[in-house]
């Protein structure tokens, strides 16, 4: 084995990176780049600004981190083996889990979009509870981060869902990190700071943003603000995606819908956010109201899932299968 290969194998943390002073390492940690993984997926420009270091130094650090993690071209077989390690969180409905090939995936952003009352927030509450279940019961024995942009989080709902599953209510509440985002800049700052939280607490396995577009839509109205809005939203979504991929976390975002006046047949509603929202989430699920407590979930876009739809129910106990 060459000395170079041996040296790469010995790099386990950012403190092991060759030629990087402790002063620079401290700056990286203070900026939230505390692991090789976060450095490897950073852009030189962002790292340079965040840590207050020269661009050339940022480029060198990123290259060293990528070399240490052996980031390279992989065979399809290697990718398949990595996909086998993706974990899933049960939604509480076997039908909905079946539509999603087992549940909500880690390392992926899943978007639920639909009209008011279609079940988006109910799913977010349920998944924040279910992620805490042991793997044999459909969870990941993990914690959740809940970013609430519309003030719709209800601890009473969490309590009902936890009680129905026989879980200790106080423990369930204590395993959900909650924050209310008051505007777009606050929402973006929260996600930027999340990197530090999830690196310190590896038990976090779910991040919820409910809803991801409401502040952007309110603060950047009209076509004259569209370019700025989409640019900020795109960067925000990619930051969430990086967290999912680097820390093996499931990211759930909810989104609103709007009517298209130029649609004369079919469903006239489309998700807010335009092409930015069409392309960033790995899985897109549309939710619709049905009779009573029944809701319809339809796969709109997912590279590994066939098109299809199922019916599930919103019950007092939480998300469940709809009765025949």
Curated annotation (Swiss-Prot):
One of its GO terms (molecular function) is ATP-dependent DNA damage sensor activity. It comes from the Archaea. The keyword DNA-binding applies. ATP binds at residues 114-121. GO terms for biological process: DNA recombination; DNA repair. Keywords: ATP-binding, DNA damage, DNA recombination, DNA-binding, Nucleotide-binding. InterPro entries: AAA+_ATPase, DNA_recomb/repair_Rad51_C, DNA_recomb/repair_RadA, DNA_recomb/repair_RecA-like, DNA_repair_Rad51/TF_NusA_a-hlx, P-loop_NTPase, RecA_ATP-bd, RecA_monomer-monomer_interface. Belongs to the eukaryotic RecA-like protein family. Involved in DNA repair and in homologous recombination. Binds and assemble on single-stranded DNA to form a nucleoprotein filament. Hydrolyzes ATP in a ssDNA-dependent manner and promotes DNA strand exchange between homologous DNA molecules. This is DNA repair and recombination protein RadA. The gene is radA.
């Amino acid at each position: 084995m060459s000395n170079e290969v041996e040296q790469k194998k010995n790099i386990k943390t950012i403190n092991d990176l060759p030629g990087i002073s402790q002063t620079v390492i401290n700056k990286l940690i203070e900026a939230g780049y505390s692991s090789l993984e976060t450095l490897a997926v950073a852009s030189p420009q962002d790292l340079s600004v965040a840590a207050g270091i020269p661009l050339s130094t940022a480029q060198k650090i990123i290259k060293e981190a990528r070399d240490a993690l052996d980031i390279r071209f992989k065979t399809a077989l290697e990718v398949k083996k990595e996909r086998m390690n993706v974990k899933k969180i049960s939604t509480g409905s076997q039908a909905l889990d079946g539509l999603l090939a087992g549940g909500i995936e880690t390392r992926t952003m899943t978007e639920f979009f639909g009209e008011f009352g279609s079940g988006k927030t109910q799913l977010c509450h349920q998944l924040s509870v279910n992620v805490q279940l042991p793997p044999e019961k459909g969870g990941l024995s993990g914690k959740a981060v809940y970013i609430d942009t519309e003030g719709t989080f209800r601890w009473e709902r969490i309590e009902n869902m936890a009680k129905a599953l026989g879980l200790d209510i106080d423990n369930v509440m204590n395993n959900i990190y909650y924050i209310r985002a008051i505007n777009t800049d606050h929402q973006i700052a929260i996600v930027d700071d999340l990197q530090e939280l999830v690196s310190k607490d590896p038990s976090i396995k779910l991040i919820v943003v409910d809803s991801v577009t409401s502040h952007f839509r309110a603060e950047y109205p009209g076509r004259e603000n569209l370019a700025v809005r989409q640019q900020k939203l795109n960067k925000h979504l990619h930051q969430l995606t990086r967290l999912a991929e680097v820390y093996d976390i499931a990211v759930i975002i909810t989104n609103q819908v709007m009517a298209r006046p130029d649609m004369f047949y079919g469903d006239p509603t489309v998700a807010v956010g335009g092409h930015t929202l069409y392309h960033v989430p790995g899985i897109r699920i549309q939710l619709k109201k049905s009779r009573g407590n029944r809701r319809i979930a339809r796969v709109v876009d997912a590279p590994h899932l066939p098109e299809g739809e199922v019916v599930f129910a919103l019950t007092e106990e939480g998300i469940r299968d709809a009765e025949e």
